[in-house]
Amino acid sequence: MPDMTSASSGTVLAFDFGKRRIGVAIGEHELRMAHPLTTIDQSMTRPRFEKIAELIEAWQPVLLVVGLSVHADGTEHEITRLCRRFARRLEGRFRIPVALADERYTTVIARSVLEEVGVTGKKQRPMLDQIAAQHILQTYFDLSHAAS
């Protein structure tokens, strides 16, 4: 997996991985601004990767960023292993560099953002994961810019 400064230009896709849903965000490395894109609402591996392949074909990213889920103290748990596996699969299938990014509290932040604009309860579900992916990607951009 590349370091935080491996890509300096081009489109970047970010993923908030979950067992049932994957949030996707998009951004341009030069602008360093992330936007929510879509949520892949599918728990089966094959349909997930078919949808991801469609996104990659459409957007031609130079880098993929996967949020790495860990406990608040930084220790790993079951989902951490699944996030790493998902990242390896992305890199292997699509031959695009993949960076891992800390995703602690992204869902909490996404929920808060949606509540601020009046989206509550079950209405959040379609947007929550893509907003979390947006936060993952924005944090990646901010940290990679600070490192350069």
Curated annotation (Swiss-Prot):
Primary localization: cytoplasm
This protein's UniProt keywords: Cytoplasm, Hydrolase, Nuclease, Ribosome biogenesis
GO BP terms, alphabetized: rRNA 5'-end processing
Cellular localisation: Cytoplasm
A GO molecular function held by the record: nuclease activity
Top-rank taxon: Bacteria
Alphabetical list of SMART domains matching this protein: YqgFc
EC top class, as a word: hydrolase
Gene Ontology CC terms, in alphabetical order: cytosol
Keyword Cytoplasm: yes
EC number: 3.1.-.-
SUPFAM superfamilies: Ribonuclease H-like
Keyword Nuclease listed: yes
Summary of the function given for this chain in its UniProt record: Could be a nuclease involved in processing of the 5'-end of pre-16S rRNA.
The family this protein is said to belong to: Belongs to the YqgF nuclease family.
Protein name listed in UniProt: Putative pre-16S rRNA nuclease
Species name: Nitrosomonas europaea (strain ATCC 19718 / CIP 103999 / KCTC 2705 / NBRC 14298)
Lineage, top ranks: Bacteria, Pseudomonadati, Pseudomonadota, Betaproteobacteria, Nitrosomonadales
